[in-house]
Amino acid sequence: MKIRFEEMRSPEIGEFIKKDGMVIVPIGACEVHGRHLPVITDTKMAYSAAIDAAEKMSGKIPVSVLPAVWFGYSISILKNWPGTITIRPKVLIDLLYNICQSLIDMGIDKILIVNGHGNNPGVLDVVVRSIGDDFKVFPGVANIFDCWDKGYVMQNRRSKPGGIGHACEIETSVLLHLSEDLVDMSVADSTDIMKSDLQTCPVDWGTSKKRKLYLSTWYLENSTYGGAGDPSCATKEFGKAIHNMTVNGLCEVIEEFYRTQQNLKGRKLNRKCQKF
């Protein structure tokens, strides 16, 4: 069975559906990532991890990966630099809703959205809940950054506090592993290292502090090049470790999600308000 959905012919997709196949919808963004990374960074990270996880799980579960949704919701401050293409949340919700509906209409009821962009989760939560309300099919969302082990990151990072955020040590390291030719390390410096130190809303991802407050931290910083962190100490080895961690985490998600969806099949769900 082919992993890439777009490479299958219609009869092959029909056979995939008969096998109770699961579809992954990768999504990222097209936005500035400093001077040193390509604008497709988030999408590339999500799609590469989804493909590798699907290939790893293909012997256990029939799974196929859609072409990536390469744009997402980006806050307006990122339009200060060339390269950012942002989609209004309501438009992005409708787009993903239609993708899920199309899959459901052809008989696919196991849909996992794999996200690589930090501004997308709120939008994606609305999509999967709306699909559940309207079709009684329950897609899932897996954010690649939720697959990362903070303990490992804290122990192995080379950047100082404030160095892991956007176009940072982690993202630069992963891109060095995936597509080194797209990275320009000659301009990867610490100019945009984050300086805010909030206790309830940590700006650095690689910290033991727990987030108790959501705040758009971009407006706390004064980015020069459209980054937030320190990419200068990125390494291909660290990137490979993070990518493999993401793939393994997604494999766990795929296995449990598929099993959970099978258990939901045939379950009767109340559509009426319960009387007490």
Where are the regions that the model predicts?
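Extended, histidine- and acidic-residue-enriched regions that form the cofactor-binding/catalytic faces
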Residues: M1-K110, G116-F276
